[in-house]
A protein has these predicted regions:
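Conserved G1/Walker A P-loop phosphate-binding module
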Residues: 1-89
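Conserved, well-folded catalytic cores of nucleic-acid-processing
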Residues: 28, 47-51, 86-93, 148-151, ...
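Canonical P-loop GTPase G-domain recognition
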Residues: 119-120, 129-189
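P-loop NTP-binding site
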Residues: 193-315
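Conserved glycine(s) of the Walker
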Residues: 17, 164, 255
Length: 315
């Protein structure tokens, strides 16, 4: 039996369905999802373990990336750094496009990035469930894209309904080289639970607020204490203006309570443990343009700081 493995980068414009595909492939909710563009701000690793089929077993390390865009803030630039770092050293790119919308310069920008990497590319035409009865339109898109690049595979699918996902898995394992098992079989991501909790809270902010508020907020976990029967979490939701703070808190604190309740239930489902969640809201004017603050939002940087603090205490 041969064992195949490799790193696969999921690339696409905002709202192409990248995070939905990651969750569908792994079978767990690793990436938050909302109808709002640029929901994903960091690259997220999803580890897919494939059992032996026809003499081949494998491990696919999927990398979900922020939506490709031309940045206009420190946050946007950091997101594009995440994209470019994900492309480095990957074995395969899954370029996702929204088949239900007309191709434009944003899709061409994504394709240019993929071409520059020199890595083999699968073209995934997502959201085909929205094209029922429009097969000529889908075939026309496939023909048009095929003239722009020599794709390794072209696969129409619906990540939301999991149509075409089995075919994608088959083609993935065929395309990846023989290699080692990079992660243990019981591991499905590299993200610590405390940082996944921050994303769950931010997801509820995205779902329960509108206009500029979702884009002007971020979440930092201040305390995360875990025991067998209870996880205690204290988190701060940062926004940029007092008016946004008022919206997040709501009348008599009702909005913040609703966000906290929904997030707590989701974290309990994720961890299988009862959760006590305490939320605070603070104003950090212009945080999206503060390179220092944006860098501190990186969970890998936060993990390094926590490790350093723990070592200092031990001394």
């Amino acid at each position: 039996m041969s064992f195949h493995s490799g790193f696969v980068c999921i690339l696409g414009r905002p709202n192409a369905g990248k995070s939905t595909l990651l969750n569908a492939l792994v079978g767990e909710k690793l990436a938050i999802i909302s109808p709002k563009p640029q929901t994903t701000r960091n690259r997220i690793l999803g580890i897919l373990h494939l059992p032996n089929q026809k003499g081949r077993a494998g491990q696919v390390i999927l990398i979900d990336t922020p939506g490709v865009h031309k940045p206009d803030s420190s946050l946007g630039r950091k997101m594009m750094v995440e994209v470019r770092e994900a492309l480095e050293g990957c074995n395969l790119i899954l370029m996702m496009v929204d088949a239900a919308r007309r191709r434009d310069t944003a899709d061409e920008f994504v394709l240019d990035l993929a071409k520059q990497s020199g890595t083999p590319v699968f073209l995934l035409l997502n959201k085909i469930d929205l094209l029922r009865g429009k097969k000529p339109e889908l075939l026309s898109q496939i023909e048009a894209y095929s003239k722009l690049h020599e794709f390794r595979e072209v696969i129409p699918l619906s990540a939301r309904k999991k149509d075409g996902v089995d075919l994608l898995l088959k083609k993935l394992i065929e395309a990846l080289p023989e290699g080692p098992r990079y992660f243990p079989e019981d591991q499905i991501t590299d993200q610590p639970a405390r940082f996944m909790a921050a994303e769950v809270i931010r997801e509820q902010v995205l779902l329960q607020t509108s206009e500029e508020v979702p884009y002007a907020t971020t979440v930092i976990i201040d305390e995360y204490e875990e025991s067998k029967k209870l996880i205690r979490i204290a988190a701060t939701v940062y926004c940029e203006r007092e008016g946004q703070k008022g919206i997040l808190i709501g009348k008599r604190g009702e909005k913040l309570k609703a966000i906290g309740t929904a997030a707590r239930l989701q974290i309990e489902k994720m961890t299988g443990t009862r959760v006590f969640l305490e939320l605070f809201v603070k104003v950090r004017t212009g945080w999206r343009d503060s390179r220092e603050f944006v860098d501190e939002l990186d969970w890998r940087r936060q993990l390094e700081n926590l490790t350093s603090s723990a070592k200092s205490v031990q001394r």
